[in-house]
Regions:
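Alpha-helical segment of the N-proximal tetratricopeptide repeat
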Residues: 34-67, 237-241
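Structural marker of alpha-solenoid helical repeat scaffolds
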Residues: 67, 100-101, 134-135, 169, ...
Length: 243
């Protein structure tokens, strides 16, 4: 017979029965697929992008666009790559090409917002993030970005509104929680900030920026904050928080 071992409430299962673990997902590339087609070149570029081999990714994505200058998946991926490289103007030009065809494309609008923000075009940034909120995959991040923009303008009410909207769609969005704590501190709502900090330290006690925010509100917690940063290269932790 075949052996099956179950430990606890199926916390660990070992089985010799093939149907318990064998999957039907395709495991081989199709032999008749044209890897030199527009989509084939894009897929190769996307694969290199996932591996963070950006030089190869750029090569194949550009090759795909040589065949079709309006191939949206390649435009979006290459725009994302250029944004990561700090080539904001180039990234923005590519993503504008997408928006000229599909004005509600979620990722394209989000990238448009990021590039516009990086170049200081805040009205365009708000425009891009606002339209990106229509897409569920980018909604929580786009709301958080809008909150950051309004906090920069010291529009505390709108910043809070967008931070809370972001958390409605993803309660564990740490960027939105950080935004909420920072804006409460900067708008002199220390009690609200400390309340959010308390919730965060219960959930993630080693999230150092939370304890730093607590220190900014209560200087007496300085020793407690620094005592928990005890990794080998502790200066890197401080530098990451500063950035």
């Amino acid at each position: 017979g075949k052996l099956r071992i179950i430990i606890g409430n199926k916390e660990l299962v070992y089985s010799e029965i093939k149907n318990d673990y064998e999957l039907n997902r395709p495991k081989e590339l199709p032999a008749d697929f044209d890897w030199n087609s527009t989509y084939g070149l894009y897929m190769q570029g996307k694969d290199w992008l996932n591996q963070k081999m950006y030089g190869n990714a750029e090569k194949y994505l550009k090759a795909a666009l040589e065949k079709d200058v309006y191939f949206i998946p390649a435009l979006v991926s290459l725009s994302s790559l250029y944004y990561k490289k700090g080539m904001y103007l180039d990234a923005c030009e590519l993503v504008k090409r997408v928006l000229s065809l599909d004005t509600y494309h979620g990722e394209a609008n989000y990238l448009y917002g990021l590039c516009s923000r990086a170049m200081g075009n805040l009205a365009d940034a708000k425009d891009g993030f606002s339209v990106a909120t229509f897409s569920p995959g980018f909604r929580t991040a786009a709301y958080e970005q809008l909150g950051e923009l309004y906090m920069r303008e010291e529009n505390w009410e709108k910043a809070e509104q967008y931070a809370l909207k972001s958390l409605e769609y993803n309660q564990m969005n740490l960027y939105a929680k950080q935004l909420l704590i920072v804006l409460y501190r900067k708008s002199n709502h220390a009690e609200k900030a400390l309340s959010e900090i308390e919730k965060m330290t219960e959930q993630l006690p080693l999230l150092h920026w939370v304890r730093f925010e607590e220190y900014l509100l209560e200087a007496s917690t300085a020793e407690e904050f620094s005592s928990l940063i005890c990794n080998e290269l502790s200066f890197e932790t401080y530098m990451e928080m500063a950035v």
